Amino acid sequence: MAAGVSSRMKNSVSSSKITSDLINQSNTRVKGFIEVGNRKEPFIYYIINNCIKADIRDFYIILSNNSKEFQKYLRNLEKKLSININFAFQDFYGREKPLGTSDAIFQTMNQYEELKNNRFLVCNCDNLYSTKAIKLLVNE
């Protein structure tokens, strides 16, 4: 899920070790698209990569409607990694921030009927799940 606005993180950026670029990203991007690590890949890349290592190839990524830059990145990643990415768009119902995880899942299930009759794994975009943990959940 990648539609959250990272308000708690934006209010806690105060370390002198944080670069101005990272501060700018935290103020202009959702958490999952902030670049991390030596590769400077968005955080969501590492989540997707661990899912691929756990044999997951189909993804439903929840975004806000104003996420064209992220959609472009994800379409390029989809081609590069030979995976399938479906976008769901979370309606904020006129609010500044989305309602939360359960609402995001509910809206996605309404946009993709096949999810109503199948098992799926939910990964928040601000947590890095190990390949081992993903495999355990998938095989449960």
Task: Identify the meaning behind each predicted range.
Residues 131-140:
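Conserved donor-nucleotide/metal-binding helix-loop-beta segment in metal-dependent transferases, i.e.
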Residues 127-129:
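A short, conserved beta-strand element in the Rossmann-like catalytic core
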Residues 30:
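Active-site neighborhood of HAD-like aspartate-dependent phosphohydrolases
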Residues 1-5:
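Glycine-rich His-Gly loop
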Residues 123-124:
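Active-site acidic Asp-centered loop
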Residues 6-27, 35-119:
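Conserved N-terminal catalytic core of the sugar/cofactor nucleotidyltransferase
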